[in-house]
């Protein structure tokens, strides 16, 4: 997710140059394009800016965190951004097609690359490939119900899935070529010299994947993606989303990009990566279980810090703390096989009482002892 946002912001100024050249019926020269390959040139310029790529990536991430509907979140985030007026470069914040979709009730049939630049939270969050591809499809067809777009997001999600599972580049390339029908045998210098601006998914997503395959590290991937020109912010966002999961992101790059990310997106990034950390924690402890995660989610409430109200049967999270911080409330796994967790002080064992068919009676003096008793009975029943 953050890799996509970094690519978007780093590529934003270069995309403006490409668009301006296109309007004048000229092109950015090869020499100008490849300047970004010089590491003395900063990835981020003073006029760098987040764009729709970052906004909609955040929308997908927030939708996952809230178990929402992709269409609803994409529209809400899009409409909120449109209300801000023109972007930093004096342009509309979204393309005409996307704005038209925002203002209609129909399914969009775009074949553009906008679906692929926003998709990275899905393959990062979900574990099983079948589920990843299904979620990818659902997130795509809301606005991009076209075979070229569907195939493009499948390719990006597959690349991220394989990258995060430590597959080698050769295998990633082979899988995408076989399953998505892409020819990834480009020549980098040829792209830098001759690639033309297009937002078509079929003519930009393969190039973005290729730039990742040609890279040596995360920053190199972003620089090479920008160096081919065209829709530079989106290509770099797609490349960055794959590169993040293959290489990781250097801390100095993370620090440098912070001033360019709006606070609400920073908040989503923080919560999304904390959730990923929590999922990894459960897997490492060999207790990853969808039912357990659902239990944590459905029994968690946010409470104001100044309230004296009790929430029986729930975990309690103060103010804007995030769900994943439940790990701090549940530091000890008492029985890994049965997912017994030390939660009596927070849940009052209400759910266990309900499962066992006992009436719930609050007894502050004995609640912990009663909770332990109920947990033992619950485990025996399991």
Give the positions of each predicted feature.
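Alpha-helical scaffolds flanking conserved acidic
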Residues: 1, 72-76, 235, 335-340, ...
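Catalytic glutamate of the conserved HExxH
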Residues: 8-9, 341, 345-353
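Post-HEXXH active-site segment of zinc metalloproteases
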Residues: 21-23, 336, 340, 352-381
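Short alpha-helical catalytic segment bearing the HExxH-like zincin motif
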Residues: 4, 230, 337-346
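Short pre-active-site segment immediately N-terminal to the catalytic Zn-binding motif
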Residues: 324-341
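Auxiliary, metal-adjacent structural segments of Zn-dependent hydrolase domains
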Residues: 274-326
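Structured, active/binding-site neighborhoods that engage oxygen-rich ligands
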Residues: 1-277
């Amino acid at each position: 997710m953050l890799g996509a946002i970094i690519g978007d912001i780093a590529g934003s100024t270069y995309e403006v140059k490409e668009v301006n050249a296109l309007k004048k019926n000229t092109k950015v020269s090869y020499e100008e394009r490849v300047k970004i390959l010089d590491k003395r040139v900063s990835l981020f310029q003073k006029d760098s800016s987040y764009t729709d790529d970052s906004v909609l990536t955040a929308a997908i991430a927030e939708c996952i965190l809230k178990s929402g509907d992709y269409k609803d979140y994409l529209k809400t985030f899009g409409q909120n951004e449109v209300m801000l007026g023109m972007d930093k470069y004096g342009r509309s914040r979204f393309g005409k097609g996307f704005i038209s979709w925002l203002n209609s009730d129909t399914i969009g049939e775009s074949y553009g690359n906008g679906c692929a630049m926003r998709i990275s939270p899905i393959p990062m969050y979900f574990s099983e490939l079948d589920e990843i591809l299904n979620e990818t499809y659902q997130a795509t067809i809301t606005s991009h119900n076209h075979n070229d777009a569907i195939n493009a997001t499948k390719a990006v999600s597959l690349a991220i899935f394989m990258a995060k599972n430590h597959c080698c580049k050769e295998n990633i390339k082979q899988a995408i070529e076989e399953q998505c029908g892409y020819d990834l045998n480009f020549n980098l210098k040829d792209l830098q010299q001759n690639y033309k601006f297009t937002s078509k998914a079929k003519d930009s997503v393969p190039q973005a994947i290729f730039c990742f395959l040609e890279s040596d590290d995360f920053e190199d991937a972003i620089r090479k993606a920008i160096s081919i020109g065209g829709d530079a912010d989106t290509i770099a966002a797609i490349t960055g989303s794959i590169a993040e999961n293959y290489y990781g992101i250097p801390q100095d790059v993370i620090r440098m990009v912070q001033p360019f990310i709006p606070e609400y997106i920073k908040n989503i990034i923080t919560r999304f990566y904390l959730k990923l950390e929590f999922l990894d924690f459960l897997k490492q402890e060999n207790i990853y279980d969808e039912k357990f995660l659902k239990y944590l989610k459905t029994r968690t409430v946010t409470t104001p810090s100044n309230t004296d109200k009790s929430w029986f049967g729930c975990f309690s999270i103060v103010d804007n703390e995030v769900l994943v911080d439940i790990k701090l409330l549940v530091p000890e796994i008492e029985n890994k096989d049965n997912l017994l967790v030390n939660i009596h002080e927070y849940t009052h064992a209400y759910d266990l009482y309900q499962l066992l068919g006992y009436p719930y009676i609050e007894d502050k003096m004995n609640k912990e002892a009663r909770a332990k008793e109920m947990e033992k009975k619950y485990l025996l029943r399991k």
